[in-house]
Amino acid sequence: MKINPRELDILKILYSSDQALTVTQIVNTREDLTQSIVQTAIRKLLAAELIEVQGIAYSGNVLSRRFGPTEKSREVIFQRFLDSYRDYKCIIGFRTAVEGMLEIEEDKAKRVEDIEVLVKLLTEMKTNDQ
């Protein structure tokens, strides 16, 4: 499934929020977003079932739908990530990719937690492959 850069931006905004957002709230997150741009992207994302209406809220005197990402969107984004890695794995090796992913985590405690999860995952995978 193809997601254009603008739709991906909208998904990132929704994933970074701890609550479902209205179109107006999404527009207010970035200066380069307009109501019409966001509404167009929202329609496409809804049709593709990558987002869903997660509630209704008043925005002034108007009822507005609140949108949030679906599990399907997580799967599509993950597949896009894997496809990108496949395209570049001859240039960026496994070790470099993992180191890079760990380095972008600024919270040292979270990084340690991620390393522990990775060690556990690798141990399980090694055990299952034997």
Please provide the spans of the model-predicted regions:
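Short alpha-helical segments that sit at the start of domains
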Residues: 1-13, 87, 91, 121-129
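Short, cationic-aromatic polyanion-contact patches
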Residues: 3-6, 22, 56-78
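Basic amphipathic alpha-helical segments that dock to polyanions
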Residues: 10, 40-48
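Short helix-capping/hinge SLiMs at alpha-helix to coil transitions
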Residues: 14-19
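Short acidic, hydrophobic short linear motifs in intrinsically disordered regions
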Residues: 20-29
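Short coil turns linking two alpha-helices in DNA-binding domains
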Residues: 33-34, 38
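A short, conserved structural fragment
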Residues: 46-58
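Amphipathic alpha-helical dimerization/coiled-coil segments
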Residues: 75-126
